[in-house]
C-alpha cells in the first residue's frame, strides 16, 4: 500500500486531537483562574455540520478517515469528497485496506450522482453499478459520506468537557447505549469557533466488563477540509457507463420501473412503465435500490423472476429487466 504518508498525517493530527480532549469520560476539572472557554452544544454542532448546510456555504467538502484496531494498528484509510453542481449532488470515495483489516489488503473506489453510483475494487475484475429510485436522491448520496454522528435511539450522551486549544473548540462526548452490554464510545470534536464547522473528529469504541474493567476496541479518526477542487481519484463511472453512440463492445441494458401515477391506473410512460436505457461494461454487477424491497423480472408479464442477489446478466449484447416494488407486486 502507498497510504503511509496519509496515515502518518492523520495519526499526527489525531494525537493532537486526543490530547486536547484529554479524559475518556466524566471528570473535567475547572480552573477558575482561567478564562471561560467558548461553549458549543451538540445541537449547534449538528446543525452547523448538516451536509446540506455545508454545501450552501462551500463548493466542496473533503473528509479523510483512518480506522485502527484495539492495538492501534491501522486497518484502513479513506478519502471522501462531495459537492453540488447545478443543484445535483456528486460524490466519490476511495478506501485503502491494509493487511490488518478483516478483508485483507485491498482498494475500493466509488463515484455517485443522484441516480446511480459505481464501485470497483482492486481485488475484483468486475465493477458494480447501483441504480436507485429513492425519493430523496441527494440524501441517499450524503448518507454515504462521513458526518457528525447522532446518538440514535436508546442512547444516553454525557458531555465530558469543552475547552479551547490553538484557536479551536474541543468538545468530548460519551455515548452509551442502554442495551449495549457494556459497549460505548467517546467522540472528540475539534471545531472552528467562528463557524462551528468540524475540523477533526475521533470516535473511540470501548467495552466495560462486569467487573468495571474498560478496554479500547478501536478508533476512527476524521479530518475535514473545505473548498478544495473537486477531483475524483478514479473515474469509476466512466469505466462502467458508455455513451449511446459508443462503438465499444458493451451490454445494452434496458430497465422498466413503475411510473409515478401508474398505481392510480393512469396511463403513464409505456403502459404504466417508465423506461431507461444505458450501456454498461460486460460483467458489470447491476443492483437496483429503492425505499422498498424490489422484485426483478425478465419479461413484461412478470413470469420470469430474476434472482435479486444473482442480479442481471450483463455478459451478453443486451439485457432487459422489469423492476417491481414488493408492495406493488401482486
PLM features per residue range, with description:
Residues 284-305:
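Surface-exposed interfaces of beta-sheet-rich extracellular modules
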Residues 1-8:
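Bacterial N-terminal signal peptides that target proteins for export
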Residues 75, 81-144:
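An acidic-aromatic
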Amino acid at each position: 500500500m502507498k497510504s503511509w504518508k496519509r496515515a502518518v498525517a492523520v495519526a499526527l493530527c489525531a494525537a493532537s486531537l486526543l490530547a486536547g480532549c484529554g479524559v475518556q469520560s466524566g471528570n473535567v476539572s475547572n480552573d477558575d483562574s482561567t478564562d471561560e472557554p467558548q461553549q458549543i452544544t451538540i445541537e449547534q454542532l449538528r446543525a452547523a455540520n448538516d451536509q446540506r448546510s455545508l454545501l450552501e456555504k462551500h463548493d466542496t467538502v473533503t473528509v479523510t478517515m483512518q480506522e485502527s484496531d484495539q492495538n492501534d494498528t491501522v486497518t484502513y484509510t479513506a478519502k471522501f469528497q462531495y459537492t453540488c453542481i447545478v443543484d445535483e449532488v456528486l460524490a466519490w470515495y476511495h478506501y485503502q485496506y491494509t493487511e490488518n483489516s478483516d478483508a485483507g489488503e485491498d482498494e475500493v473506489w466509488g463515484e455517485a450522482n443522484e441516480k446511480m453510483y459505481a464501485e470497483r475494487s482492486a481485488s475484483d475484475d468486475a465493477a458494480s453499478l447501483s441504480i436507485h429510485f429513492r425519493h430523496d436522491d441527494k440524501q441517499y448520496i450524503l448518507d454515504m459520506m462521513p458526518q457528525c454522528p447522532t446518538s440514535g435511539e436508546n442512547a444516553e450522551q454525557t458531555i465530558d468537557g469543552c475547552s479551547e486549544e490553538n484557536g479551536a473548540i474541543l468538545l468530548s462526548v460519551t455515548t452509551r447505549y442502554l442495551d449495549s452490554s457494556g459497549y460505548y464510545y467517546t467522540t472528540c470534536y475539534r471545531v472552528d469557533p467562528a463557524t462551528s464547522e468540524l475540523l477533526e473528529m475521533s470516535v473511540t469504541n470501548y467495552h466495560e466488563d462486569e467487573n468495571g474493567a474498560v478496554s479500547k476496541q478501536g478508533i476512527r479518526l476524521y479530518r475535514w477540509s473545505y473548498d478544495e477542487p473537486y477531483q475524483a481519484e478514479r473515474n469509476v463511472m466512466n469505466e462502467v457507463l458508455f455513451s449511446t453512440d459508443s462503438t465499444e463492445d458493451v451490454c445494452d441494458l434496458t430497465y422498466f420501473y413503475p411510473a409515478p401515477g401508474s398505481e392510480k391506473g393512469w396511463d403513464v410512460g409505456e403502459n404504466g412503465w417508465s423506461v431507461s436505457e444505458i450501456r454498461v461494461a460486460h460483467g458489470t454487477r447491476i443492483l437496483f435500490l429503492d425505499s422498498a424491497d424490489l422484485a426483478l423480472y425478465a419479461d413484461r408479464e412478470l413470469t420470469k423472476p430474476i434472482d435479486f442477489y444473482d442480479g442481471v446478466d450483463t455478459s451478453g449484447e443486451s439485457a432487459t429487466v422489469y423492476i417491481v416494488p414488493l408492495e406493488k407486486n401482486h
